């Protein structure tokens, strides 16, 4: 867990003399202990090694056979688990979050459970009901992390839709909503009404079993959103595979009809938009305008995106157009355009529009802070920033020190639950891990500074 060396005092707002570019040179690393920095450097270097990411699950099984569960588990807890996971128990999570708060960072809890799109469907509803229980407990934990609890500050947590409904159903809905006339049968308003009433919609494209599963899925989503709203916790819905996006967007829109209305006090259900997809800018603009016309609050988590290798492979297999941007630069340009669109929207609509700039890219973060100052957007959380726990701390700490609202995405749970989740995330975010070279350099420089006081390491 984190060990704080100094308590960080953050500013109340942007610089009074004009915008000043933030420095992401690792200067804020003085807030962390030498042991933390050493572990971070070693783990990030390990995770940047492609064979470890590609064969992570196999290597984990091999280490358990060779070392035994006890030694293997101890090694993981001291390395990867300790770097990226808050802990297993509520007390461990609270301890991690308390340390983050001394660094002016806030928690964004994530339940590490999901269903892979190509996996066999789970039998019955029991698996999804179990996940519902985990989500409700996450709501409780998210709310309990505020000390003392305050209605002035809402907690945030991540929500994975395919933990509550099957990917097979999502694929059926995704193919159906693209057809002419489907908008009447599967409108967000009709789904929202079914969530409230519990009625079976009898959607014509689904068989009886699928319709029953849809009914149960809508009920689960409604129960999570209803409980989260009562506990003052905002839900950030995770992005998933492109093949599921139309269904996920439909379900999020249905939740928004109910929970993002003006009387509810801002967006309680947010959607995630991936800049790596070619259609994201147009879809984001369309959704923002639709929410504004309907009088609904609009919450967005903007990410560069994941799943790139699999998205391209699936498109090639089925002879479809690649839905992803052609290269890193195109993705960066897409992110910049989406960021500008949303910041302008926030400036115009104030508390009815919230944005999380979820990026490890220094230039994207600088663009956001500069435009916030130019547009007069206050540092009250309508625009916040997000990075993964255990990564990009040189950016997170600098933002927190400057007074911006910063969240760290925090998975928690047992080794058995979290390690497979982390390996999948690593496989989906190879570019992020391999692109963390600058952070490794900054960590190395800080460690050299501590080990050899007064000496400067000559860069290679």
Curated annotation (Swiss-Prot):
It is an enzyme of class 1 (oxidoreductase). GO terms for cellular component: mitochondrial inner membrane; mitochondrion. It comes from the Eukaryota. The modification N6-acetyllysine is found at residue 310. InterPro entries: FAD-linked_oxidoreductase-like, Proline_DH_dom, Proline_oxidase. One of its GO terms (molecular function) is FAD binding. Its EC number is 1.5.5.3, 1.5.5.2. Keywords: Acetylation, FAD, Flavoprotein, Oxidoreductase, Proline metabolism. GO terms for biological process: proline catabolic process; proline catabolic process to glutamate. Its cofactor is FAD. It holds the Pfam family Pro_dh. Transmembrane segments: none annotated. Hydroproxyproline dehydrogenase activity is inhibited by THFA,(1R,3R)3-OH-cyclopentane-COOH and 5-OH-1H-pyrazole-3-COOH. It catalyses: trans-4-hydroxy-L-proline + a quinone = (3R,5S)-1-pyrroline-3-hydroxy-5-carboxylate + a quinol + H(+); L-proline + a quinone = (S)-1-pyrroline-5-carboxylate + a quinol + H(+). Dehydrogenase that converts trans-4-L-hydroxyproline to delta-1-pyrroline-3-hydroxy-5-carboxylate (Hyp) using ubiquinone-10 as the terminal electron acceptor. Can also use proline as a substrate but with a very much lower efficiency. Does not react with other diastereomers of Hyp: trans-4-D-hydroxyproline and cis-4-L-hydroxyproline. Ubiquininone analogs such as menadione, duroquinone and ubiquinone-1 react more efficiently than oxygen as the terminal electron acceptor during catalysis. Belongs to the proline oxidase family. This is Hydroxyproline dehydrogenase. It comes from Homo sapiens (Human).
């Amino acid at each position: 867990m984190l060990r704080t060396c100094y308590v960080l005092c953050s500013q109340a707002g942007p610089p009074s003399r004009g915008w000043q570019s933030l420095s992401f040179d690792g200067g804020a690393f003085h807030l962390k202990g030498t042991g933390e920095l050493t572990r971070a450097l070693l783990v990030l270097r390990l995770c940047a090694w492609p064979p470890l990411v590609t064969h992570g699950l196999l290597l984990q099984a091999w280490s358990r056979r060779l070392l035994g569960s006890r030694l293997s588990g101890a090694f993981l807890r001291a390395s990867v688990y300790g770097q990226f996971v808050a802990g297993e128990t509520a007390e461990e999570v609270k301890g991690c979050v308390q340390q983050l708060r001394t660094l002016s960072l806030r928690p964004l809890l994530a339940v590490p459970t999901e269903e892979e799109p190509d996996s066999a469907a789970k039998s019955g509803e029991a698996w999804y009901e179990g996940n519902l229980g985990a989500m409700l407990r996450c709501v409780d934990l998210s709310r309990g992390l505020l000390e003392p609890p305050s209605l002035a500050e809402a907690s945030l947590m991540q929500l994975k839709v395919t933990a509550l409904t099957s990917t097979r159903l999502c694929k059926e809905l995704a193919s159906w909503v693209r057809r002419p006339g489907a908008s009447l049968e599967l409108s967000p308003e009709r789904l929202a009404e079914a969530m409230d009433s519990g009625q079976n919609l009898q959607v014509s494209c689904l068989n009886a079993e699928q319709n029953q599963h849809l009914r149960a899925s809508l009920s689960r989503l409604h129960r999570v959103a209803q409980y989260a709203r009562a506990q003052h916790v905002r839900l950030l819905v995770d992005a998933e595979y492109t093949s599921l996006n139309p269904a996920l967007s439909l379900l999020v829109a249905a939740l928004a009809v109910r929970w993002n209305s003006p009387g509810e006090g801002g967006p309680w259900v947010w959607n995630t938009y991936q800049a790596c997809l070619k259609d994201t800018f147009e879809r984001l603009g369309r959704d923002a305008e639709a929410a504004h016309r309907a009088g609904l609050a609009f919450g967005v988590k903007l990410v560069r995106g994941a799943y790139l290798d699999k998205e391209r492979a699936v498109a090639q297999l089925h002879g479809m157009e690649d839905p992803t941007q052609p290269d890193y630069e195109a993705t960066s340009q897409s992110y910049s355009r989406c960021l500008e669109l949303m910041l302008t929207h926030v400036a115009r609509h104030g508390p009815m529009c919230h944005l999380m700039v979820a990026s490890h890219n220094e230039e994207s973060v600088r663009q956001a802070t500069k435009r916030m100052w130019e547009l007069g957007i206050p540092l009250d959380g309508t625009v916040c920033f997000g990075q993964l726990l255990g990564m990009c701390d040189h950016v997170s700490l600098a933002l927190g020190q400057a007074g911006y609202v910063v969240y760290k995405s925090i998975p928690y749970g047992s080794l058995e639950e979290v390690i497979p989740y982390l390996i999948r995330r690593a496989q989906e975010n190879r570019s992020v891990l391999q692109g963390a070279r600058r952070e490794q350099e900054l960590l190395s420089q800080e460690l050299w500074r501590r080990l050899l006081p007064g000496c400067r390491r000559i860069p290679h």
